[in-house]
Amino acid sequence: MTGLAITGPAISSLRATGGGGGPSSAVNVILWVAVPYISIAIFVVGHYWRYRYDKFGWTTRSSQLYEGRLLRLGSPLFHFGILLVALGHIGGILIPESFTSAIGISETAYHAAAVTLGTIAGFCTLIGATILIYRRRTVGPVFSATTRNDKIMYVLLMATILLGLGTTVLGNLTGHPYDYRLTVAPWFRSIFYLHPDTALILKAPIGFRLHVLAAWVLFAFWPFSRLVHVFSAPLGYLTRPYIVYRSRDPQLGSRAPRRGWERVQ
């Protein structure tokens, strides 16, 4: 049976930063080993529990009836932006650098494409989320329908977006972009290999580490928010019968229908 282990380089790094079993090493193990696994467990079990016992709550709680103009502007920006961001993260984290080099994609070309598309997607997500939050705060009926969970979700979501976009933009503006595929990506993969190597994540700049921590907290909160609708798709619509709308059949007989009131003489 495969067991969870912290690799040798991680132990050496922890000793270097905290001195064996000191407070710093304990904090590093909590942040970069315990927190990811706790977040993943809550994410998986929480979604199962939510679907099993709260199917009627598995919804976006749409507020389109209350206001449509801002929603038509902010919602597409946010959803298309966050989709591109998610695909970019999946590709950048799960696909190792050795694979892209083997298929002929140079580091310069990969970095240019990742930064350009990532920045565009990030700003679309940020602008869309800002519009949706502004709408939720300023439109009375929408604000009244906003729950405490919604507010926590928006705080965590915006923190994760801002930290991620900030590390990307600031790193390139200063002329010192950081290649996260050398540290953050292999650390993330090591978590799923059940051999978390904290030495890798500790080499990353503080901005990347804060972004990662914010993401883990968001994932842990995900099952208890309206974000569960990400895993819903109206597949039943493809096979269900058409809904046919018909006007009322004309009344049979030659007698004209009587009115429901009589004139007072």
PLM features per residue range, with description:
Residues 1-30:
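Short, strongly hydrophobic alpha-helical membrane anchors
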Residues 27-34, 69-73:
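N-terminal membrane topogenic signal
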Residues 36-40, 78:
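Alpha-helical transmembrane segments
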Residues 40-53, 84-93:
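Alpha-helical transmembrane segments of multi-pass membrane proteins
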Residues 43-55, 125-136:
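Membrane-water interface of transmembrane alpha-helices
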Residues 47-66, 226:
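Membrane-interface helix-loop junction between the first two transmembrane segments
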Residues 62-76, 82-83, 87-191, 202-206, ...:
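Long, contiguous internal "core" modules enriched in hydrophobic/ aromatic residues
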Residues 197-198:
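A short, charged helix-loop
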